[in-house]
């Protein structure tokens, strides 16, 4: 295990440096400044200074507008609208929407379906999804309609996510579980990842999801402990998120657990490392890092642009700590398709191992 000690605000390591495979030592990584090097290399300001309104977008985050001529993208967008399905790709203004919906190199298109409507009962300060204390009631036909729609798309891995529904007794866990069950009936071989809320810490709701037949249980930590009250809704706590991830693994040992962290909100390297250790202690398998990007002027400002080089270093740290899979990059999101094929192999291998035993 890679260890570190705290001395006020400085990060120091023991004389025994732990080297990452084929890369710099963890000490070198921490000591290397992300901002100073990047300012010189890219010629832009990397950290938000006092009284500054916002940071200019760095070159590696500039993406093209989805092309209306892209057949797959246009077809999927029309289907989603016709079936009145909500996707986190659209609601959260994901920068990867064209890549995931279009498909490439014989890779099927991927969409992350957002269940239980497009209105959340929580108001996290980084998220652009609509909020309300009393969202519209659930559509009882949504589970079967969603399953049929996904079956028609012909994909082999799907991510189901949802808004928070604190207005419902079980937080909507039974609704999500019903969707998974219908999906497995329509497509027995499809792999299902559920990116779910914390259900206010309800372990019975966690059990409902974990026993639904899903393959990957995902719940996002979003940020480090210190920033959680500032970044997330007050009802979402750091320890509560750890609790649901830990219980999902205890309830179903074969399940793949997954979480995601946004960088650029003002966290320190030491705080990120502490979070990674917390996640490994409870057996989380997969991890993604992505750059926080302010969706509108009403949301939190970006405090720092993290360079692609720094994201690559975090990937190496994640791998060295023992995560089965670490996806790390400025535009990586928790449901980004890049890791789905790897996770699919992990799920299949675990299922095969369970059957053999």
From Swiss-Prot:
PROSITE patterns: RADICAL_SAM. This protein may be expected to contain an N-terminal transit peptide but none has been predicted. It holds the Pfam family Radical_SAM. GO terms for cellular component: mitochondrion. It is found in: Mitochondrion. The keyword Iron-sulfur applies. [4Fe-4S] cluster 1 binds at residues 89, 94, 100, 335. InterPro entries: Aldolase_TIM, Elp3/MiaA/NifB-like_rSAM, LIAS_N, Lipoyl_synth, rSAM. Its main location: mitochondrion. It is an enzyme of class 2 (transferase). GO terms for molecular function: 4 iron, 4 sulfur cluster binding; lipoate synthase activity; metal ion binding. The keyword ATP-binding does not apply. Coiled coil: none annotated. Its cofactor is [4Fe-4S] cluster. It comes from the Eukaryota. Pathway: Protein modification; protein lipoylation via endogenous pathway; protein N(6)-(lipoyl)lysine from octanoyl-[acyl-carrier-protein]: step 2/2. It catalyses: [[Fe-S] cluster scaffold protein carrying a second [4Fe-4S](2+) cluster] + N(6)-octanoyl-L-lysyl-[protein] + 2 oxidized [2Fe-2S]-[ferredoxin] + 2 S-adenosyl-L-methionine + 4 H(+) = [[Fe-S] cluster scaffold protein] + N(6)-[(R)-dihydrolipoyl]-L-lysyl-[protein] + 4 Fe(3+) + 2 hydrogen sulfide + 2 5'-deoxyadenosine + 2 L-methionine + 2 reduced [2Fe-2S]-[ferredoxin]. [4Fe-4S] cluster 2 binds at residues 120, 124, 127. Residues 105-324 form the Radical SAM core domain. Belongs to the radical SAM superfamily. Lipoyl synthase family. This is Lipoyl synthase, mitochondrial. HAMAP family: Lipoyl_synth (MF_00206).
